[in-house]
UniProtKB/Swiss-Prot annotation:
Task of the protein: Necessary for formate dehydrogenase activity.
Membership in a protein family: Belongs to the FdhE family.
Location(s), subcellular: Cytoplasm
Protein name: Protein FdhE homolog
Keywords from the named record: Cytoplasm
Listed InterPro entries: FdhE-like_sf (IPR024064), FdhE_C (IPR056796), FdhE_central (IPR056797), FdhE_N (IPR056774), Formate_DH_accessory (IPR006452)
Gene Ontology cellular component list: cytosol
Origin organism lineage: Bacteria, Pseudomonadati, Pseudomonadota, Gammaproteobacteria, Enterobacterales
Gene3D superfamilies: FdhE-like domain (3.90.1670.10)
GO process terms (BP): protein maturation
Superkingdom of source: Bacteria
Entry's Gene Ontology molecular function annotations: ferric iron binding
Length: 309
């Protein structure tokens, strides 16, 4: 099954009535996203061996919140939605969408917001980024989008990605269409931008019990049924791992068929779980999965692979 975004004027009346039965997509709601993430990161840092890094990530998330409101994005995506729908492609496809200079503005604003909070190596990194040319910034963005992590140092990548993610999330929040589930390609990539998930969440509330994968770039969430590998769609050899007990709010879902795993979080166990923060705070579980021979099928926006990984 794949998910395709349909222009509003192309939805039939029956589709409009049933569109909310099981929403295939949950577009980003930016009003409280970054503040909530920053708060969760700070909370998780209290008793975590990676506490300092979680607090560092919280500073970036808070800066994203500030910059979001300082630099709103105005854009009409109607034509792009229509063209993408006709081509069967994600409307904000990271591999073909032209990037404008808005994301450069976001990056420099993030740097300005973060400089007073940074010191030592982190300060040196953002000062180096501040001096980078537009061409250098574009080269780093393009490298990250094709997973060429050897071309972008792992200390620069989170800052570059924070600006790109904010830009793509702003665009995704403006999409004037609905989503429709269709037979076709797999759902391992985001239907809005084509990027990878960071983790998945089994939700509460109006989407009680439904699993949604959370995009690590545009912050969109898309529905994937439970007890099925989100990477290869097989269901015969799935196992669930946790560091605590069977009632843990954060687990790793491993697939013996493709040899990968993805974190799955349960809001019914802890309503405060957050896709990025709780994934980053459970890196010990990642280490365990690596020991068991599984490869991660997702990337956290604050933890990019280094050269040679």
């Amino acid at each position: 099954m794949s998910i395709r975004i349909i222009p509003q004027d192309e939805l039939g009346s029956s589709e409009k009535r049933t569109a909310e039965a099981i929403p295939p997509l949950l577009f980003p709601r930016l009003k409280n996203l970054y503040n909530r993430r920053a708060e969760r990161l700070r909370e998780l840092a209290a008793n975590n061996p990676l506490g300092d890094y979680l607090r560092f990530a919280a500073l970036i998330a808070h800066a994203q919140e500030v910059v979001l409101y300082d630099h709103p994005l105005q854009m009409d995506l109607t034509a792009r939605i229509k063209a993408a729908s006709e081509q069967g492609k994600p409307p904000l496809d990271i591999h073909v969408l032209p990037r404008d200079k808005h994301w450069h503005k976001l990056l420099h604003s993030l740097i300005a917001e973060l400089k007073p909070e940074m010191s030592g190596p982190a300060l040196a990194v953002i000062e180096n980024l501040e001096k980078a040319s537009e061409q250098e910034l574009e080269q780093m963005a393009s490298a990250l989008f094709v997973s060429d992590f050897a071309s972008v140092s792992s200390d620069k990548a989170p800052f570059i990605w924070a600006a790109l993610s904010l830009y793509w999330a702003q665009m995704a929040s403006l999409i004037p269409g609905k989503a429709r589930a269709e037979y076709g390609e797999q759902r391992q990539f985001c239907p809005v931008c084509g990027s990878m998930p960071v983790s998945s969440i089994v939700q509460i509330g109006t989407t009680q019990g439904l699993r949604y994968l959370h995009c690590n770039l545009c912050e969109t969430e898309w529905h994937v049924v439970r007890v099925k590998c989100s990477n290869c769609e097989q269901s015969r050899d799935l196992h669930y791992w946790s560091l605590d007990n069977e009632q843990a709010a954060v687990k790793a879902e491993s697939c013996g068929d493709c040899g990968t795993y993805l974190k799955i979080m349960y809001q019914e166990k802890d309503p405060k779980v957050e896709a990025v923060a709780d994934d980053l705070a459970s890196l010990v579980l990642d280490a365990r999965m690596e020991q068991e021979g599984f490869a991660r099928s997702s990337i956290n926006p604050f933890m990019f692979p280094g050269e040679g990984e």
